[in-house]
């Protein structure tokens, strides 16, 4: 059963993480298509593909995707998947409005702090070789812990990472409401 989360902390710049919903799908699709060269799937994502992805996403309880918000505006998105004792950060994409303001770095700091305090300490990501996001992850406390022909594997370095204290996590159950008598 999918839960919706809102994660907040006293962090500057002030950002919050909010679980994605159906109303975010078009923004997510446009953002990903605008930077598709930085991802393994380089094709154009159409509306039908996005809706199919969203339906499948709802079936994966250990997969979380958030909108990064600042002053009520969408700064971008980022997510993580829990697999085999590790959290894989994925889809870190700034919106056109959110680029270059430090909001995504603050969002990633909040995300990793949340993961480390509520789930696992082993946090990483996989970056396509040549993707300029590698420098972003490096600035945010990740280091290259492995490599393959087409990708770099990065891991969060807890010795240099500065976690924030999570102030609030609101959870709402998005499952279907049971009718009385069932």
Residue ranges of predicted features:
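A short beta-loop-alpha structural element at the N-terminal edge
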Residues: 14-30
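Conserved GNAT-fold acetyl-CoA-binding loop/helix
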Residues: 36-55
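A short helix-loop-beta-strand connector motif used in the catalytic cores of GNAT acetyltransferases and
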Residues: 55-67, 76
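Conserved beta-strand in the GNAT
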Residues: 67, 73-81, 88
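A short, internal acetyl-CoA/4′-phosphopantetheine-binding micro-motif in the GNAT/acyltransferase core
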Residues: 90-101
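Conserved acetyl-CoA-binding loop-helix of GNAT-fold acetyltransferases
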Residues: 100-114, 135, 139
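Conserved beta-strand-loop-alpha-helix junction that forms the acyl-donor binding cleft
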Residues: 124-135, 150-155
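Conserved acetyl-CoA-binding loop of GNAT-fold acetyltransferases
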Residues: 138-148
């Amino acid at each position: 059963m999918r839960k919706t989360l809102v994660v907040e902390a006293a962090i500057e710049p002030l950002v919050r993480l909010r679980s994605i919903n159906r109303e975010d799908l078009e923004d997510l699709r446009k953002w990903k298509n605008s930077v598709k060269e930085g991802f393994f799937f380089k094709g154009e994502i159409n509306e039908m593909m996005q809706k199919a992805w969203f339906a499948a996403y709802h079936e994966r309880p250990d997969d979380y995707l958030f909108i990064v918000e600042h002053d009520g505006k969408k700064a971008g998105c980022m997510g993580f998947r829990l697999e085999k004792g590790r959290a894989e950060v994925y889809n870190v994409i700034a919106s056109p409005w959110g680029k270059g303001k430090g909001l995504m770095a603050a969002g990633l700091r909040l995300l990793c702090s949340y993961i480390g305090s509520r789930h696992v300490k082993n946090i990483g990501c996989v970056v396509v070789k040549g993707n300029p996001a590698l420098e972003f992850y490096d600035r945010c406390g990740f280091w290259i812990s492995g490599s393959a022909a087409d990708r770099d594997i990065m891991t969060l370095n807890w010795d240099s990472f500065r976690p924030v204290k999570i102030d609030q996590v609101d959870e709402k159950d998005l499952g279907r409401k049971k009718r009385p008598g069932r």
